[in-house]
């Protein structure tokens, strides 16, 4: 596993198409923003595991900016 240190506002690249930006840090929570093409699926791990198990239907679209408050 690659481990990186980033500050708020700093970004890392995954390949040529995906960027991950640190949006904020509060206590032990880190908010990140991910910019990826629509054909690249981005899920929280627990949601991804549900999808893999077929436990429950998951909305087909990702929610962007669903919680922009700090």
Curated annotation (Swiss-Prot):
Transmembrane segments: none
Superkingdom of source: Bacteria
GO cellular component annotations of the record: cytosol
GO BP field: mRNA catabolic process; negative regulation of translational initiation; positive regulation of translational initiation; regulation of carbohydrate metabolic process
Alphabetically ordered keywords of this record: Activator, Cytoplasm, Repressor, RNA-binding, Translation regulation
Chief location category: cytoplasm
Listed HAMAP family: CsrA
Protein name, per record: Translational regulator CsrA
Organism: Xanthomonas campestris pv. campestris (strain B100)
